[in-house]
Amino acid sequence: MSRSARIRRIALATGTVTALAATLFTAAGAQADPAPAAAPDIDVKAVKADLDQLQSIADANGGNRAHGQAGYKASVDFIKGKLDKAGFKTQLQEFDNNGAKGYNVIADWPGGDESKTVMSGAHLDSVDAGPGINDNGSGSAGILEVALAVAKADLKPTKHLRFAWFGDEEDGMVGSQSYVEKLGADKSKIDSYLNFDMIGSPNPGYFVYDDDSRLEKVFKDFFAKKNIATEKETEGDGRSDHAPFKDAGIAVGGLFSGADYKKTEAQAKNWGGEAGKAFDACYHQSCDTSKNLDDKALDNNSDAIAHAVWELSS
């Protein structure tokens, strides 16, 4: 064989192998699973519109939305109505406390592995003293808009998604405790529970639950990308609806923007706001109205909820 013919044959063989490799690579790429879609931005105007509705409900019902009061049941009907319209499977879970009937709103998004349920929750009730717009209309409205975003995207999660609005948290997590007790053997099907209690405090901090490192990392990574420093949540530790889940051995996480603890100088440097003042000076008071909010914190935390729901359910 001549040298030139040998070179031509080698070149031909090399080209064939290269073409075959390219074909295989292209086919493999076409068959690869697509990357999960990123969570959408949650419109803070929509969250605030929900809070305005909760304020109107309180105004029309004696100034509060407390357990056993007409304002609470009207809040339940408002939340459930929006979820039903969006295509969620909803149920009202009843319980009794202090001689009054309470309600949890439970909403399941069809699809996903129900043996691995990612659950997000917030308490819907206020104290008797006021409308409870930050505590905890903020968390309730935040997860409502995330749930509606799930429906709008027609999300097809790998894990099942459930949202909950608990009653009578203010008397000691009564609604969430009732829910967890009724789970029975189905406790093992809850992959994680995320709690959102006060996410729009007017002098806000950015606190992340550290009860489970996997869930904590999801939130911390989100805020790190936005150059927002976070701290470990300690003020509300064991004082909100995540506690019954944690006691049952379920992984819990969540966010909190502060209540009646005072912001330090270092925190004011990181987050802005006023050092020496409470994160929420209207905590459990009549002034916890729709004016008692920080829009930026409400926006950032609502987006963080969406990020966690999308990531943990994929």
Regions found by a protein language model. Give the residues of each.
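Metal-dependent peptidase/peptidase-like ectodomains
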Residues: 41-42, 166-263
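N-terminal capping segment at the start of a domain
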Residues: 34-70, 125-126, 279-286
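A non-catalytic alpha/beta surface segment that caps or lines the substrate-entry region
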Residues: 52, 56-110
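His/Asp/Glu-rich mid-to-C-terminal helical/loop segments that flank catalytic regions of hydrolases
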Residues: 264-314
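Sec-exported extracytoplasmic/periplasmic mature domains
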Residues: 52-60, 80-91, 147-155, 180-185, ...
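Extracytoplasmic/secreted proteins, especially bacterial periplasmic and envelope-associated proteins
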Residues: 46-49, 53, 70-90, 138-145, ...
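Secretory targeting and sorting signals
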Residues: 1-32
